[in-house]
Structure formats: C-alpha cells, structure tokens
Amino acid sequence: MSLTELTGNPRHDQLLMLIAERGYMNIDELANLLDVSTQTVRRDIRKLSEQGLITRHHGGAGRASSVVNTAFEQREVSQTEEKKAIAEAVADYIPDGSTIFITIGTTVEHVARALLNHNHLRIITNSLRVAHILYHNPRFEVMVPGGTLRSHNSGIIGPSAASFVADFRADYLVTSVGAIESDGALMEFDVNEANVVKTMMAHARNILLVADHTKYHASAAVEIGNVAQVTALFTDELPPAALKSRLQDSQIEIILPQEDA
C-alpha cells in the first residue's frame, strides 16, 4: 500500500503512522524523525487535528479517538493475509527445540501465533503481548525480563531488560524494524527499544528479519545494525534494487512467501 493512502501527503501519513504506533509523540521527537522544523510539525499537527485525524496536546499530539484508528485498522486488515503468510514462513524456518528471542511489534505477534504448533521452544521476549500469545502452550518455556513497561505496545525496556537478555544465547532472533535504508542500515524509532534489540542481535546465532514492503520507504532515527548481520529476510515484496544487491552480496536469504502458500 502506498504511503500517501491516508491523506495524499507522504509526510502527513508518516506522522500519522508514528502516532498510531506510539500513541503520543512530542513535537521535538516528530521534528527529528521527520527531518523538518518544529514549526512545520506544529502546522502539520494543527491541520491533521482539524481533520479529526489526531488529537492536539500541549507540546505534542496523540491518537484521535476514532477516525485515525479506524483508518489504520483498515490498513492492518488489508495486510493481514500478507503478514500471516510471512509469519508462517518464519515458523516453518524454526525447528522444534529452539531457543528464540522475539522483540516487540504487531508483525512478530503474527509469528508468535504461527509458532503455537511447535514443540519444546524456549522463548525470551520483551513483549508482554507475545508472551501472552505463547504461554498457553504447555510445551513452551516463556521468559520475560524485568524493566519499564510501555503502555502503548506492552514492550519492556531499560537496562535490566537488556541485561537479562544478555544472559542467553538464542538459536534465532525474530524481529521487525522501523525502516531498512538503501545502504542496508536497520533503523528503529525508539532508542530504549533499540538497546534491547541490539543486545538480542549480539546474542543470537541466526537473525530472522520480518519486514513488509513499507519498511523499504519508511524513515526512523536509531540505527540498530545492518542487513549484513541478518540470516534471512522474510518479506512480501522484493526490496528495491540497491538494497537487494546488498543482500545478495552478503548472501542473505530473501524469503518471499505466497499468500496462498
């Protein structure tokens, strides 16, 4: 789906996506991530709030109670089959008896559901949503770290979370990202979430990157690594030429599942 599908303005759509994902963002954060001035962000917030797409707050903006959430729910539903197909491919890649890191996000939550028929998995995750999906399987051992709990995505962050993760060596890391740059940089929005992901990357034997096509054109501020570190990219569309070339040069497997597979 195109990034201009909601408003016809790519920057406005990116601002809406950030707020939909995070729940609330202040003006300085938005200016930094969108690479514009704070004055531009204030104008954008004013315009979008007048359209009922977000709610203005002192120093920032948050989700609207209905319109923007409905728009993003429709976007999510339209991509559900794609995400399910990607998730099934990831689950097929992981054998029974594995130790797995799983990060935060709606995409990896699909992977968690796809793993439910596996046996004897040990899962370390900093997502309470992922843990809640997986703990029902009595054949799984599910572990979560201590730390600071984020209300908008049920993620656990902070030094204690990273320290807990560092005590393990996982067979696989399943993670998504905020954006993939054309030079192969893997980017995230939040520095605190990024620190936990970087620790997981350093302690995983195989990194399985789950990213739909929108990540090729997104923008985020915090670099967590490079595609050269990845074992396999699971996606719904082939990457742009420059990124595809980097993946091939690094012998990274690109897995492109069919929706009806």
Curated annotation (Swiss-Prot):
Stretches assigned to the HTH deoR-type domain: 8-63
A Pfam family annotated for this UniProt entry: DeoRC
InterPro entries in the record: ArsR-like_HTH, Carb_Metab_HTH_regulators, DeoR-like_C, DeoR_HTH, NagB/RpiA_transferase-like, Tscrpt_reg_HTH_DeoR_CS, WH-like_DNA-bd_sf, WH_DNA-bd_sf
Domain of life: Bacteria
Regulation: Inactivated in the presence of the effectors sulfoquinovose and sulfoquinovosyl glycerol, leading to the de-repression of the target genes.
Keyword set includes Membrane: no
GO terms, molecular function: cis-regulatory region sequence-specific DNA binding; DNA binding; DNA-binding transcription factor activity; ligand-modulated transcription factor activity
Induction: Negatively autoregulated.
Ranges annotated as DNA-binding: 25-44
One annotated GO biological process: negative regulation of DNA-templated transcription initiation
Keyword annotations: DNA-binding, Repressor, Transcription, Transcription regulation
Assembly notes: Monomer in the absence of DNA. Exhibits a high level of cooperativity once it is bound to its target DNA.
Stated role: Involved in the regulation of the sulfoquinovose operon. Represses the expression of the yihUTS operon and of the yihV and csqR genes. Binds DNA inside the spacer between the bidirectional transcription units comprising the yihUTS operon and the yihV gene, and upstream the csqR gene itself.
Name by which UniProt lists this protein: HTH-type transcriptional repressor CsqR
Species of the source: Escherichia coli (strain K12)
Name of the gene: csqR
